[in-house]
């Protein structure tokens, strides 16, 4: 008797390079295992799948090794923030204030 397979997608994106890989995995496969089976870790030198945060359709999953995928789910591998969001907001507010003063 053959294993039941499900179709899932694994995605990862950098500003200059993005990958979406569709693959069939055995029913009962974890999010982490699907990411490893996709081979995406070999396409991005700095990507450590064991440590990378992951989610499904925009929702972070705390334990990718324990999340069993459902048919059609998309595993999203997130990269770390390159800038502090608070500092970015402050910078934008300061620029907006400066632009307002310049127009007066």
Swiss-Prot record:
Record Gene3D superfamilies: RnfH-like
InterPro entries in alphabetical order: Mopterin_synth/thiamin_S_b (IPR016155), RnfH (IPR005346), RnfH_sf (IPR037021)
Region named Disordered: 80-104
PANTHER family listed in its UniProt record: UPF0125 PROTEIN RATB (PTHR37483:SF1)
Family, per entry: Belongs to the UPF0125 (RnfH) family.
Protein name: Protein RnfH
Gene (UniProt): rnfH
């Amino acid at each position: 008797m053959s294993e039941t397979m499900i179709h899932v997608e694994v995605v990862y994106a950098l500003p200059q390079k993005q990958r979406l890989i569709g693959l069939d995995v055995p029913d009962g496969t974890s999010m982490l295992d699907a990411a490893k089976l996709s081979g995406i870790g070999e396409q991005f030198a700095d990507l450590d799948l064991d440590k990378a945060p992951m989610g499904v359709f925009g929702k972070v999953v705390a334990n990718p090794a324990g999340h069993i995928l459902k048919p059609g789910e998309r595993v999203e591998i997130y990269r770390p923030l390159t800038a502090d969001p608070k500092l970015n907001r402050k910078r934008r507010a300061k620029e907006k204030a400066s632009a307002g003063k310049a127009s007066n």
